[in-house]
Amino acid sequence: MRKSRALRVLGLALVTVALLAASASADPNPNSGRVPVTPPPDDVFTDICPFPVLIETVAIKEYSKTHKNGVEIITGRLVVRITNTVTGESKVYNISGPGQITRDGAIETDVFLGRALLFDPFFGMLVTSGRVVATFNTETGEFRIVSRRGHVEDVCATLAG
């Protein structure tokens, strides 16, 4: 479940407004509070779609900043390739967000703006474009979409062939 959470949070790129090329290629100002996001390792997930899927990071230049009020903002560029490991069918997605995380005890409220990759065994794997609000319980692992506006692509259906 931790791998799923790590990729969901990473999917906060969440998430698609990429930084301008100049700012994305520059190192963050050490006084800005921005910290580079470390991608999780590429991994195969067997409990999301009716077939195993491999999620690979193609490009990452994301940064996280936690503000004084505790809200964490993730911005930058994130591109992943998702592959149906049975058929070899794959698709590349820009899921550059941005995203916002607010924590209250064990409950994390995630706001995804732009494009995001969200997945859970309950609803499958989705790439969203628009605003999505979700909650994640860090103790139980429950991930729930509270509201969404915009386009949604069912990645499992896309890769089913």
Predicted regions and their residues:
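Bacterial N-terminal signal peptides
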Residues: 10-21
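Sec/Tat signal peptide C-region and signal peptidase I cleavage site
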Residues: 22-26
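Bacterial N-terminal signal peptides that target proteins for export
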Residues: 1-10
